[in-house]
C-alpha cells in the first residue's frame, strides 16, 4: 500500500490525500495531483 501525501509549500503540515495498491498507480496519482495543485503543494509517495 502506498500513500500520496501533500505538504503545502509554506507550512510543515502533511496530509494523506490518496492511496494506491501498487507503485505504478501511486506514481500516476502523484502526477495527476502535481498537475492539479501546480507548485502550491509538494506531493510525495510513501510506502506503508
Segments (PLM) and residue ranges:
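Short, mixed-charge low-complexity intrinsically disordered segments
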Residues: 13-14, 27, 31-48
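Intrinsic disorder/low-complexity segments
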Residues: 21-22, 48
Amino acid at each position: 500500500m502506498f500513500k500520496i501525501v501533500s505538504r503545502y509549500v509554506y507550512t510543515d503540515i502533511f496530509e494523506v490525500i490518496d492511496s494506491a495498491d501498487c507503485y505504478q498507480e501511486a506514481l500516476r496519482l502523484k502526477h495527476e495531483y502535481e498537475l492539479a495543485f501546480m507548485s502550491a503543494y509538494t506531493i510525495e509517495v510513501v510506502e506503508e
